[in-house]
Amino acid sequence: MANSKRLFGVVRRKLLRRSQSRITIIRSSAPETTREEIAAVKIQAFFRGHLARRAFKALKSLVKLQAVARGVLVRRQARIALHCMHALARLQVRVRARQLLSH
């Protein structure tokens, strides 16, 4: 058990040294970002966020418009169906009255 712990520690230290050297190389080869580049990235991010919010707002208003239009259509269909049901009820009353009078 003690040997495996020691071996694990040795391997871990070697890996850490390798990863640290890689990190150093990567950092030294990457160009440093200037304040202007950071500011430009922030401005671009804010502008993209603005465009996304504007597109979302337009989509939301379009969905509301669709809901209103569909509501108008449904109310119209309900009114027509109710009118037809009343007409059928009146017709049914007339037919039954005729049947009673003819008997």
From Swiss-Prot:
GO terms for biological process: response to calcium ion. Gene3D superfamilies: 1.20.5.190. InterPro entries: IQ_motif_EF-hand-BS. SMART domains: IQ (SM00015). Its main location: nucleus. The keyword Cytoplasm does not apply. The keyword Acyltransferase does not apply. GO terms for molecular function: calmodulin binding. Residues 36-62, 63-87 form the IQ domain. It is found in: Nucleus, Nucleolus; Cell membrane. Pfam families: IQ (PF00612). GO terms for cellular component: nucleolus; plasma membrane. Keywords: Calmodulin-binding, Cell membrane, Membrane, Nucleus, Repeat. Residues 10-22 are annotated as: Calmodulin-binding. Belongs to the IQD family. May be involved in cooperative interactions with calmodulins or calmodulin-like proteins. Recruits calmodulin proteins to microtubules, thus being a potential scaffold in cellular signaling and trafficking. May associate with nucleic acids and regulate gene expression at the transcriptional or post-transcriptional level. Interacts with calmodulin (CaM and CML) at the plasma membrane in a calcium ion Ca(2+)- independent manner, however, Ca(2+) seems to modulate calmodulin binding. Binds to multiple calmodulin (CaM) in the presence of Ca(2+) and CaM-like proteins. This is Protein IQ-DOMAIN 20. It comes from Arabidopsis thaliana (Mouse-ear cress).
